[in-house]
């Protein structure tokens, strides 16, 4: 199966039309393109990415990678096409030797949507980088190309798309309404930046595959740019992930458009979605928490790559106000009330949030106290 997929890879000449060949560092790529030496151009582009400096990813440190037992299991299971899709459906389902991306063992839309988030891809990347075992990279390339080939982006009827996106179970809905929902598109845009770093050095990551990756990645960005969700936390997720795409791949001609689009939406929506008391307008503790982390993630990605000034000081003030709101609605053990669509949360996860927030607000005494204090001490509410 791996050989079949490898043979199916093509050197996608159109990838070079998507790239700004005048971007610093791409001189050899441009020279090869000018001679129409596409194989040489693809190899030079891969050489460039394997040695690229100047772009920082705040979510991953290749020099200090770790993998949990759970992640290792997801990676190993994925080799047999048993995919971790949803914690609510365990043990995970097997999707067949010839992967069936439309397999729907339980008629829950979340199970169908979240299959297309490829949650096991990043653990496979970690397993590859830590072990050096090419089997993870070969299988990732296989699954990546298999997904591209079996999940084409085709025209969608808006009314059908809205029904499926709203959560109505539509057993007769075309696969595209699940595979290409905006939230899943944005999830792949974000996570594939880490996966790119994890797998780029692999032998299985060929010059031909790189061109396939670029064409597919650009398809995602172009689609999302024209099809953002109308409102709410989904729109925030999509905008933040568009920032990731634009910042991480500045070589793409549309990179600045993507980055600016995401940042503009976040700057607009933080005023629209957050009340004066710091509460996010969907009034759900975990949506509120997600919104905080969305705003913070976009800021971190911009900050470590030279775009911090595209977020005004009011943006940071609002984020801090949101953190204070969240601290005040949580219980002394750092769990939160379970109203609306919220989950309980747990101490370790919430402590990690305060650690990340403290990195953005190092001079904030009360965030420091909430991060370093005993969880049972309820005297620290702000």
Label for each model-derived stretch:
Residues 134-150, 201-227, 253-269, 307-329, ...:
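Extended, well-ordered alpha-helical scaffold segments
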Residues 205-209, 236-237, 247-248, 253-306:
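The feature captures the catalytic groove of carbohydrate-active enzymes
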């Amino acid at each position: 199966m791996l050989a079949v997929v490898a043979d199916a890879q093509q050197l996608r000449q159109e990838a070079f039309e998507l790239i700004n060949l005048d971007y610093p560092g791409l001189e050899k790529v441009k020279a090869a393109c000018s001679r129409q030496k596409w194989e040489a151009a693809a190899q030079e582009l891969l050489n460039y990415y394997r040695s690229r400096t100047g772009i920082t990813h705040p979510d991953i440190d290749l020099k200090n990678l770790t993998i949990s037992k759970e992640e290792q299991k997801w990676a190993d299971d994925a080799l047999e096409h048993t995919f971790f899709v949803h914690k609510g459906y365990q043990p995970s389902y097997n999707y067949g030797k010839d992967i069936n991306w439309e397999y729907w063992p339980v008629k829950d839309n979340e199970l169908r949507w979240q299959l297309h988030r490829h949650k096991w891809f990043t653990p496979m990347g970690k397993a590859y980088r830590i072990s050096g075992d090419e089997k993870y990279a070969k299988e990732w390339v296989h699954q990546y190309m298999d997904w591209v080939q079996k999940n084409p982006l085709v025209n969608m009827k808006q009314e059908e798309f809205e029904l499926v996106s709203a959560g109505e179970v539509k057993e007769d809905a075309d696969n595209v309404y699940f595979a290409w929902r905006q939230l899943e598109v944005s999830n792949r845009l974000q996570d594939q930046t880490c996966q790119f770093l994890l797998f780029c050095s692999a032998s299985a990551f060929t010059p031909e595959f790189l061109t396939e990756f670029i064409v597919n990645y650009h398809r995602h960005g172009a689609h999302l740019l024209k099809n953002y969700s109308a409102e709410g936390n989904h729109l925030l997720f999509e905008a933040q992930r568009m920032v990731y795409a634009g910042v991480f791949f500045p070589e793409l001609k549309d990179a600045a458009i993507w980055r600016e689009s995401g940042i503009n939406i976040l700057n607009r929506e933080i005023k629209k979605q957050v009340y004066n008391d710091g509460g996010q307008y969907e009034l759900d503790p975990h949506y509120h928490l997600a919104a905080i982390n969305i705003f913070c993630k976009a800021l971190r990605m911009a900050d470590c790559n030279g775009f911090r000034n595209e977020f005004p000081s009011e943006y940071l003030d609002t984020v801090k106000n949101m953190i204070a709101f969240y601290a005040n609605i949580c219980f002394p053990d750092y769990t939160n009330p379970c109203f609306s669509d919220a989950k309980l949360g747990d101490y370790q996860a919430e402590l990690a949030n305060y650690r990340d927030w403290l990195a953005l607000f190092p001079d904030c005494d009360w965030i420091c106290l909430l991060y370093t204090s005993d969880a049972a001490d309820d005297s620290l509410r702000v």
